[in-house]
Amino acid sequence: GFGSFLGKALKAGLKLGANLLGGAPQQ
């Protein structure tokens, strides 16, 4: 559902944000 999509987007956003702030891209 839409809630699941929001949850995934939020987690992805947090992960990207942490990588950008940390300056250490990890995938």
Curated annotation (Swiss-Prot):
Give the record's keywords alphabetically: Amphibian defense peptide, Antimicrobial, Secreted
Q: Where in the cell is it found?
A: Secreted
Q: Which family does it belong to?
A: Belongs to the gastrin/cholecystokinin family.
Give the transmembrane ranges.
Answer: none
Q: What does this protein do?
A: Antimicrobial peptide.
A Gene Ontology cellular component where this protein is annotated is: extracellular region
- The species this protein was found in: Xenopus ruwenzoriensis (Uganda clawed frog)
GO terms, biological process: defense response
Q: What is this protein called?
A: Caerulein precursor fragment R1
Is Secreted one of the keywords? yes
Tissue expression profile of the protein = Expressed by the skin glands.
